[in-house]
Amino acid sequence: MSAAAAPAAEGEDAPVPPSSEKEPEMPGPREESEEEEEDDEDDDEEDEEEEKEKSLIVEGKREKKKVERLTMQVSSLQREPFTVTQGKGQKLCEIERIHFFLSKKKPDELRNLHKLLYNRPGTVSSLKKNVGQFSGFPFEKGSTQYKKKEEMLKKFRNAMLKSICEVLDLERSGVNSELVKRILNFLMHPKPSGKPLPKSKKSSSKGSKKERNSSGTTRKSKQTKCPEILSDESSSDEDEKKNKEESSEDEEKESEEEQPPKKTSKKEKAKQKATAKSKKSVKSANVKKADSSTTKKNQKSSKKESESEDSSDDEPLIKKLKKPPTDEELKETVKKLLADANLEEVTMKQICKEVYENYPAYDLTERKDFIKTTVKELIS
């Protein structure tokens, strides 16, 4: 025990070296590599921050992007000469009704039709001329070009399709697909509808005025027939009066001539009686002639009346039966037009115009208020 305690005591008595005198620990190779990597990362971050700061600073003007213009394509379209290919049908300008409708349309209203026919909008001066020269599409039905035209027409609104139908003298009733088929079928082989030329409103109004004037003249003629007969009777009375006056003057002259010879023979008295009888017979003959003349005139007037009645009987029944449309008929036409029309686009003026076109023989301007009220009732 004493031997073990002795070294321990020796150890306790030995001096402890100070901490500052310890040797510095040398870093290993791994620690050096990690420090180098950290330094590199710090340098990279600093470089990135500097680049960001540089990018924020605007130096000079920004480079503009060059605009690519399709000048070559436009010039190629302009250089292509305009040619009208001959179709299978008749030229639109040679069809009377279509020529009439074309003359009434403005050039701006024909742009879409021109584009449909020739794949170009056309100029204002040549729109009507080019549309009139069209005689049908050169391609067949069901081809790719036909389908392209069909797709082009389907993009049009109903109002535009109906205006095209109006120019081409086609029915304007139906759905979009029906109108498209109708227009394409006609444009493949244009031909006249066979209907007569529509009368303009001015001519129809003049015609109605003439009809009114003619009816007024017939009434006047009927009224003037009676005065003519009366004038004949009065003329016969005047003739009788004149004859009486002449006979009285003749008697006075004869009496004056007979006065100087006071003595008259029986023969002279008989002669006087005979002359008086002859004068009476002349008077009766004059009266009969006047009566016969009046009867002849009456017969002539009755013949004229019968001839006018016969001529009116010879007229066709359609002329006699033609009457302006009733309120119910106008209401039905307005119903049909509203059913086919697009209420968001159609105006009251267009509906009134279409109603007038359904009845071109009559002037319906006086019944415009009734048409408007019916439209409002049907819409509400």
Swiss-Prot record:
Phosphothreonine sites (modified residues): T294, T295
DNA-binding region residue numbers: 342-356, 372-376
SAP domain sequence ranges: 153-187
Compositional bias segments (type: Low complexity): 283-296
Pfam families per UniProt: DEK_C, SAP
Location(s), subcellular: Nucleus
Compositionally biased region (Basic and acidic residues): 20-31, 52-67
One GO CC term, this protein: nucleoplasm
PTM-bearing positions, type ADP-ribosylserine: S284
GO annotation (BP), single: positive regulation of transcription by RNA polymerase II
Residue ranges, annotated region (Disordered): 1-67, 188-330
Composition-biased stretches (Acidic residues): 32-51, 247-258
Main location: nucleus
Disulphide bridges, residue numbers: none
InterPro entries: DEK (IPR044198), DEK_C (IPR014876), SAP_dom (IPR003034)
Keywords attached to this entry: ADP-ribosylation, Chromatin regulator, DNA-binding, Nucleus, Phosphoprotein
Domain of life: Eukaryota
Modifications after synthesis and translation: Phosphorylated by CK2. Phosphorylation fluctuates during the cell cycle with a moderate peak during G(1) phase, and weakens the binding of DEK to DNA.
This protein's name: Protein DEK
Record organism: Mus musculus
Lineage: Eukaryota, Metazoa, Chordata, Craniata, Vertebrata
